[in-house]
């Protein structure tokens, strides 16, 4: 597993992002059955990426919380739903409930989540590379949006691009 340097990751993604976004736009319009390729790409990326070496998602992004997430975490912290919401969360312009600020208040100094076992559903699924609805993720621009934050997403999209180069 390669050592991750966020600065070099950022430079790398900035060079590649326009081509990769164009690839994802093409992919969204294609009729290719993606799940088989996505499963293979997902297996391969975790041989090269260690999330704890990065935690950029927790430092630069915020999950979308479900009401169930908020109840579960609030109960764990000994707070009411409203107390937890008022202290840590806000509702954004899309009506999604998100963290009030970044980095995430649950990110430890060691890049580990201090509520890992009860973390939000969105965090559990991130970077969404092992989903059954890959086409939906491509069409909804999940990977396009995550590309500049997440080395695993970058590698996933690059692997898909390599696998599908002769099919698009």
Kindly label every feature range from the protein language model.
Residues 1-168:
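Short loop/turn segments that flank or connect secondary-structure elements
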């Amino acid at each position: 597993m390669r050592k991750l340097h966020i600065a070099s990751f950022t430079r790398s993604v900035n060079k590649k992002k326009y081509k990769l976004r164009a690839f994802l736009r093409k992919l969204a319009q294609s009729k290719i059955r993606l799940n088989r390729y996505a499963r293979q790409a997902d297996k391969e990326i975790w041989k090269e990426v260690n999330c704890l070496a990065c935690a950029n998602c927790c430092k630069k992004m915020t999950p979308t919380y479900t009401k169930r997430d908020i109840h579960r975490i609030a109960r764990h912290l000994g707070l009411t739903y409203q107390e937890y919401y008022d202290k840590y969360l806000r509702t954004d312009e899309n009506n999604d409930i998100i963290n009030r600020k970044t980095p995430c208040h649950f990110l430890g100094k060691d890049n580990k989540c201090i509520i890992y076992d009860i973390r939000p559903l969105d965090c559990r699924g991130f970077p969404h590379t092992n989903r059954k609805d890959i086409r939906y993720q491509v069409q909804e621009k999940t990977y396009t949006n995550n590309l500049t934050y997440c080395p695993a997403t970058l590698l996933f999209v690059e692997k898909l691009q390599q696998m599908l180069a002769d099919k698009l």
